[in-house]
């Protein structure tokens, strides 16, 4: 085992015995084997595409398979083995469609066993540390992009060109069936692929936003209660709004109340979801606090995506859906939540109403574009001096209190936009108002970075200037691979001066880091006081 794809990797180097996330050496190895199988599949898919052969089901499978290798998504070795076997079957399907002769003497499961004996891991990328670093940036970016592409596809939104790039990225640096390999491309070539990944991720997030809006309505500013309501209860964590919608439909009229958790908070801002009266509030904070929070919740919990941690203390109350999995946890297939609902009826629920603070969410792209005249007038008049986007992933590693302190110390003449689970460091803070604008504006989930970028771009166009000329600064926290893909999107869009923390990715080589500093002005966070002063110059 040698895994360094997340921010909390051991000693800021790599996990070698067991993952900080909880994955075993066996699961880590299976994930490496799955990536290997997907790279082989990618070559077959590209060859088929060259002949005009596209199989949408295999495209969807590919992003689904990449998604399960993200941090804190799926820890079930049986599930990963089935994906490896299906990747082999899909590769042979492409070969047959191209008219190639297939050796069927080896069954897919036997090929899986053969792959299991192969050495895999980080050292397989490239012997040159810089090329190795760029290849890792590309792979982790592809994983994040695939997560968003998966969510978009579930809502009926996809783009053949997006899948084609994912195949191209997977195939890069890996030998095709004739043994040809393009690993020896230059670092500049690798970085070009990395930036193209950022552009592809922008497209994936665009598709997802379109799917969410068409399915659930345009997000609007909405009050959300942090209190509890007497009665049976189900907690929904993750990011998949369709899973939440399906559960709301199936629990309507049952007397069971639904609470959001983690990055499900912005769901309350979507009109079609908010219309369900038994979607009563939000419970808990970010993913790393789930052991304490879930153990106190008097009902079952549904994990629709990452981040799931070892639920051993309450495993009988945990259910998963979609790509998420943990050994021994009940999985809800095909949108059927009957067993989850049965468990909710068995558990006590909340015994009484508990009033809680109310906060605002649902400030999507359209809300801020509608407020653009107010924002621009405030900037021109000097009332609004600066806009900070403070968002990204939260985590357990020390140093993340920086973000709550940053927001608390942001001057009264500034506005803080936020998104992702990083907001839970300060989401319940009352920062007051600037005129008619709240000083703390929750734009949504991590994928709503697309909306934030569109808003900033629109402001720049109105002011006839570049994005980097605006009084806007990005202060980001990262943890897993979706954050990597978003960072690549920002780089591809030419956004400069990003502050990143709490630590820099261990897979980024010193030379590439210097390139990012030189070309994009990326810098590690220091202290809130120093960074605020510098960014407001």
From Swiss-Prot:
Protein keywords: 4Fe-4S, Cytoplasm, Iron, Iron-sulfur, Metal-binding, Oxidoreductase
Cofactors demanded by this protein: [4Fe-4S] cluster; hybrid [4Fe-2O-2S] cluster
Localization annotation: Cytoplasm
Pfam families (UniProt xref): Prismane
Gene Ontology BP annotations: response to hydrogen peroxide
Catalytic activity, EC: 1.7.99.1
Positions of modified residues (Cysteine persulfide): 393
Binding site for [4Fe-4S] cluster: 3, 6, 15, 21
Function recorded in the entry: Catalyzes the reduction of hydroxylamine to form NH(3) and H(2)O.
Name used for this protein in its record: Hydroxylamine reductase
Organism: Lawsonia intracellularis (strain PHE/MN1-00)
Taxonomic lineage of the native organism: Bacteria, Pseudomonadati, Thermodesulfobacteriota, Desulfovibrionia, Desulfovibrionales
